[in-house]
């Protein structure tokens, strides 16, 4: 194959944006996750399980739409900083998070069987976390950007606090399968979500230690793991079901049975 033609095709794919490749891969992986969850839940009749499937299918479904939009250059704007530097800010990513992170938290809240006030508080603080992060990304001065980042990070810590206290206490009163699944998913959320503010602060929206291409790759890996990986663990667990049917046991349940 002609190297010049190959390079021209690669340049066309990237459209002058080094992050386009990762956005395309992210779109594909989110779509695969969406259709896998749809196929897995197609014949499920258990009422509780259908609720979890409906919520969990929406998560990568929404994310795939956001990633496809970003792939085509939609949902991105230029922000000129006070220093004169111009940044590409993908606000579509924040729109994705604003819808998908509450759904992930709703899955956890349903597992723990907490009251509506707790669910509303948790989702409200989560929305505050996302919105203040977006305001920080759109701000033009370092002081404003880092102040809003701090505000968003504090909101995240409150979300984490709720997960590790109120929701965990409620989940502890339920079955062993529910406790095991809840603890696994909470650990996954705690680790992955902690990486987001760190990546924000070292990425182009913060200190600029890493470039947009690497930043987009890292966000894509985090997003796919936090959404598709979360759903894979949840939907394989007996914890989502009532009395009528059960999928294959989770890895934690298999290990316990072997003991």
From Swiss-Prot:
PTM annotation (N6-(retinylidene)lysine): residues: 227
UniProt GO MF annotations: monoatomic ion channel activity; photoreceptor activity
UniProt-annotated location(s): Cell membrane
GO terms (BP aspect): phototransduction; proton transmembrane transport
SMART domains on file: Bac_rhodopsin (SM01021)
Pfam family, one: Bac_rhodopsin
Propeptide residue interval(s): 1-6
Regions crossing the membrane: 19-40, 50-71, 91-112, 116-138, 143-171, 175-203, 212-244
Key words, A-Z: Cell membrane, Chromophore, Hydrogen ion transport, Ion transport, Membrane, Photoreceptor protein, Pyrrolidone carboxylic acid, Receptor, Retinal protein, Sensory transduction, Transmembrane, Transmembrane helix, Transport
GO cellular component, one term: plasma membrane
SUPFAM superfamilies documented for this protein: Family A G protein-coupled receptor-like
Name of protein: Archaerhodopsin-2
């Amino acid at each position: 194959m002609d190297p010049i033609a190959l390079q021209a095709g690669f340049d066309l794919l990237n459209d002058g944006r080094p992050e386009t490749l990762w956005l395309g891969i992210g779109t594909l992986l989110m779509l695969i996750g969406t259709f896998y969850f749809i196929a897995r839940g197609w014949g499920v009749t258990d009422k509780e399980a259908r609720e979890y499937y409906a919520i969990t299918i929406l998560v990568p479904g929404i994310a795939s739409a956001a990633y496809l939009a970003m792939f085509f250059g939609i949902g991105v704007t230029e922000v000129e900083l006070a220093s004169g530097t111009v940044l590409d800010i993908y606000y579509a990513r924040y729109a994705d998070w604003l819808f998908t992170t509450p759904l992930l938290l709703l899955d956890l809240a349903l597992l723990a069987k907490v009251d509506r006030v707790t669910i509303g508080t948790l989702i409200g603080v989560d929305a505050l976390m996302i919105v203040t992060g977006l305001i920080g990304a759109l701000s033009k001065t370092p002081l404003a950007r880092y102040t809003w980042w701090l505000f968003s990070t504090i909101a995240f810590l409150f979300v984490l606090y709720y997960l590790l206290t109120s929701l965990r206490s409620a989940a502890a009163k339920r079955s062993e399968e529910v406790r095991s699944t809840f603890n696994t998913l909470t650990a996954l959320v705690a680790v992955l979500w902690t990486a987001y503010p760190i990546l924000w602060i070292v990425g182009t929206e913060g200190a600029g230690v890493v470039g947009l291409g690497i930043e987009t790759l890292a966000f894509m890996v985090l997003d796919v793991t936090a959404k598709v990986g979360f759903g894979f663990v949840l939907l394989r667990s007996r914890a989502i079901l009532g009395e009528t049917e059960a999928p294959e046991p989770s890895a934690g349940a298999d290990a316990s049975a072997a003991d």
